[in-house]
Amino acid sequence: RQICIRDRAVTSMLALNPLIKNDLIDTDHIVVDSKIGSSGAGAGAGTSHAMRAGVIRPYKPAKHRHTGEIEQELSETAGRKIKVSMSPHAVDVVRGILCTNHTFLKKDVDEKELWKIYRSEYSEERFIRLIRDKDGLHKFPDPKFLVGSNFCDIGFDLDKDNNRLIALSASDNLMKGAAGSAIQNMNVMSGFDEFEGIMYSPLTPV
């Protein structure tokens, strides 16, 4: 089954799927905070530079239409109905999406075990990169470093005081979130090399 899922859905789902598959999180309390550039919206007054520059604008903070896509795919993984709350924000970039996925742990798990779970899930997936730098400016996924590529970067942080696991995921909404995933699916369905035509390095710095 090859499904081409939209930008916010695929970006958040890739971070959440291993956690649900391993029954690590409370599936009744998943909150997705997504931030996306202007290319994620249609043409209109709200996407002009004058209106978009400098903004961090919430829109459709409840019942966004892409919520159903996330719930559909995660429910299939879990084998039961899962509910997700998602609140998107428009930000002052053209391309890129960052999902901060707030989850709550059902069992005690440490950072080492979480990395093992993510590596086990994505070790064969060349378009998924696991990101964590203990020092430096870019400790977590950042869509700036994904523009023009079909990669999705995933990382996480643990809030032990509140039993919270924050799974972070970033992608280029026009590539992994749209055309890149479509071409990748077409390659698989047609028997081509999965990476044909989409194995590009990110366009950073621009």
What is each model feature region?
Residues 13-20, 67-71, 115, 119, ...:
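Predominant activation on well-ordered alpha-helical scaffold segments within soluble catalytic domains
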Residues 27-33, 38-167:
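C-terminal substrate-binding/catalytic lobe of Rossmann-fold NAD(P)-dependent oxidoreductases
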Residues 123, 144-206:
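C-terminal helical cap and adjacent loop that interface with cofactors, partners, or active-site loops
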